[in-house]
């Protein structure tokens, strides 16, 4: 059974229940198979409002999920709905959707303004309306100073932001971004993350896929985790972190004198294992991951240690999946 990480409050009995509102994105028992290969198996979820990270290793089913959502694939079983409507019966919901695919399909000879305004025209805008909207969204993604530059001369990060701008030109209520940070330099990643967070604050429903846990953590707390085509977790990342405290974690500290450091900072029962790969490196095994990280800075400073690095070798998506999938990773 998939772990339930949703956090629900208590209903107020004095308030009459409101009419149910269909989620923006709804999958009900959705599967997609290619012969004996199951790309997605029995996925059920409903998403509305804010930013949700779609996490999974390569081949987990993230792109299949998005292709089903965008009508590029028909489900083998189950139903997919957008804004309460089956898009295979009525494609009108796609007028309210912006999609940023993983792979680039851009016209390098066009300027950013020409590229984005062309898509605005395809949404039925007049030439002047299209240019106005193109300028607005290019400014929103931080490209206002290069709107007349050819896309072929753009960096990877600038190209990604141009793709995001083209997906926003119709002012969509749902924005779907497939691996938007892949291949970007640190500055571009930070800029794109800021854009995604801002879209969530504006009340849009934003789905962003990644295979890197730390990327999603910097964008949102709401996540969906896929593994081998199955939904293994859905909900708040902090709740998942609390569950992870039930299993041992490794903390790696690199400093001038690993053994002296261990003597000053280690205190049972927080720590149940210690090892020294070399004179400068200390590995700590603990069940109290959050507590250790909260106490380490004070203990290091109070005891005058010179520490160059603190990291968590097992604090990644693969380790998280290993726990959620019962070790089958």
Please annotate each region the language model reported.
Residues 117, 121, 128-146:
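Conserved ABC ATPase "signature" region
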Residues 175-179, 184:
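Catalytic Walker B motif of ABC-type/P-loop ATPase nucleotide-binding domains
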Residues 193-285:
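ABC transporter nucleotide-binding domain
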Residues 78-93:
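Conserved ABC transporter NBD signature motif
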Residues 249-319, 324, 329:
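Short, charged/small-residue-rich alpha-helical element at the C-terminal edge
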Residues 57-61:
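Walker A (P-loop) phosphate-binding loop of ABC-type ATPase nucleotide-binding domains
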């Amino acid at each position: 059974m998939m772990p339930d990480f949703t956090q629900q409050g208590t209903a107020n009995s004095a308030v009459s229940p409101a009419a149910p509102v269909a989620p923006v994105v709804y999958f009900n028992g959705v599967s997609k198979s290619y012969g004996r290969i199951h790309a997605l198996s029995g996925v059920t979820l409903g998403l509305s409002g804010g930013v949700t990270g779609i996490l999974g290793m390569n081949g987990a089913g993230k792109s299949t999920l998005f292709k089903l959502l965008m009508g590029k694939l028909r489900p083998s079983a189950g139903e997919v709905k957008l804004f309460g409507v089956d898009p295979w019966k009525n494609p009108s919901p796609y007028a309210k959707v912006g999609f940023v695919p993983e792979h680039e399909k851009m016209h390098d000879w066009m300027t950013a303004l020409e590229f984005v305004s062309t898509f605005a025209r395809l949404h039925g805008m007049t030439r002047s309306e299209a240019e106005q909207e193109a300028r607005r969204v290019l400014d929103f993604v931080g490209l206002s100073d290069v709107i007349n530059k050819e896309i072929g001369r753009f960096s990877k990060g600038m190209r990604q932001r141009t793709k995001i701008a083209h997906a926003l030109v119709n002012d969509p209520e749902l924005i779907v971004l497939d691996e938007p940070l892949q291949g970007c330099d640190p500055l571009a990643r930070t800029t794109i993350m800021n854009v995604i967070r801002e879209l969530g604050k504006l009340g849009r429903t934003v789905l962003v896929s990644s295979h890197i846990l730390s990327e999603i953590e910097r964008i949102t707390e709401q996540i969906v985790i896929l593994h081998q085509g199955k939904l293994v977790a859905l909900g708040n990342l902090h709740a998942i972190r609390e569950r992870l405290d039930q299993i041992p974690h490794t903390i790696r500290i690199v400093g001038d004198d690993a053994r002296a450091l261990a003597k000053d900072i280690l205190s049972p029962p927080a720590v149940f294992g210690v090892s020294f790969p070399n004179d400068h490196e200390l590995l700590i095994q603990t069940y109290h991951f959050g507590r250790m990280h909260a106490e380490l800075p004070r203990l290091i400073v109070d005891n005058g240690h010179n520490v160059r690095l603190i990291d968590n070798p097992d604090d990644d998506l693969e380790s998280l999946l290993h726990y959620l999938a019962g070790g089958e990773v």
